[in-house]
Amino acid sequence: WYDCCGFGFRHIISEREFTRSFTMDRKIRVAREEAKADVMLANDTGCVTTMDKNQWIGRSHEQNFTMPIMAEVQFAALACGADPFKIVQLQWHASPCEELVEQMGISWDESKQRFQAYLKEVEAGNIEHLYNPELAYGGTA
């Protein structure tokens, strides 16, 4: 269970099918079907990327094992109430995170609507709408 995620070193380039099948068969499927896990956390960005992105590739090969994959810090930030889009950046993930976010008591749809409104303000050049972390804990802009 605790072996490599499949990213490895040179085989990610030279043996991509090995990497994909290893990730899907030895990690994602086992976590979902045997461990009944709701999420998989990793501290290595290579592991997060490999296990996250290989899920949509796996679907094209009829390996439909879906599992939210995120970095430990992303999960911790969500647990502390951070915005799933502005701060945690879940919109960049290929694995489905919506259900997990809802299980954590955060409305995915409301968060997405706020983020889309925020993007429109930024696109319009309203610089005061850019995220300023100091404002999150009572500082001044």
Predicted segments — roles?
Residues T19-A35, T50, Q55-W56:
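A short, acidic, amphipathic alpha-helical segment used as a generic capping/interface helix at domain edges
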Residues R26-V39, S95-A124, A141:
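Extended, charge-rich low-complexity interaction segments
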Residues V48-K53, A77-G81:
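Short active-site-adjacent structural elements
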Residues R10-H11, M51-R59, P84:
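Histidine/acidic-residue-rich catalytic or RNA/ligand-binding cores of hydrolases
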Residues W1-T19:
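Short connector loops at secondary-structure junctions
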Residues H61-A94:
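Short, flexible loop segments at boundaries between secondary-structure elements
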Residues E15-M24, P84-Q103:
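A polyampholytic, Gly/Pro-enriched intrinsically disordered region
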